[in-house]
Amino acid sequence: MEVILLERVAKLGQMGEVVKVKDGYARNFLLPRGKALRATADNKGKFEHMKADLEARNLAAKEEATKVAEKIDGRNVVVLRQASESGQLFGSVTVRDIIASFAADGIQISRSQVLLDMAVKTIGKHQIAIAVHPEVEVAVSVTVARSVDEAERINRGEDISTKREDKDAAAEAIAAAGEFFDPDAMHEDEATEQ
């Protein structure tokens, strides 16, 4: 089916282009959401009359989206989750969690604007794209950590997995040294020998 795009659609085309798409995509996505019109002779004429109005609306929406993009561009959002020692989350960080983090800061974005292919399932710093407008896209950092202290260490660039391993090794060394130099343990050994 041929359709006329009423706005820019990712991986499809710009506003005003006539593109050929599968019937199901047009009927179930583009047409109901007002992103396209069927490419009939009548609709082509209507589009030419509507084109100036659509371009003005698109420009206003793009300016508003640019203001929002300036607020969130490069922002770092911290999401706290429980995780295993290896850094694997018990659960995941989804689009809904990212939206809630921005809402806590007073910034409203919709689920369709967050471009997250798969849910985040590991601790660390992750780059996520947000399309505030079809023509305006920004990148934000999402730091997933077990605690606020750990999130700060991740943001400073420290490798938390080695820190945890170093702490475990240090604790084992202290425990071994404590057993080696424990004066009570020495007296117990002498008492058992007699």
Curated annotation (Swiss-Prot):
An example Gene Ontology CC term for this record: ribosome
SUPFAM superfamilies registered for this protein in UniProt: L9 N-domain-like, Ribosomal protein L9 C-domain
GO terms (BP aspect): translation
Keywords carried by this UniProt record: Ribonucleoprotein, Ribosomal protein, RNA-binding, rRNA-binding
UniProt keyword rRNA-binding present: yes
Pfam families: Ribosomal_L9_C (PF03948), Ribosomal_L9_N (PF01281)
PROSITE patterns named among the record's database cross-references: RIBOSOMAL_L9
GO MF annotations in UniProt: rRNA binding; structural constituent of ribosome
Stated family: Belongs to the bacterial ribosomal protein bL9 family.
Primary role: Binds to the 23S rRNA.
Protein name: Large ribosomal subunit protein bL9
Organism: Rhodopseudomonas palustris (strain BisA53)
Higher taxonomy: Bacteria, Pseudomonadati, Pseudomonadota, Alphaproteobacteria, Hyphomicrobiales
Gene: rplI
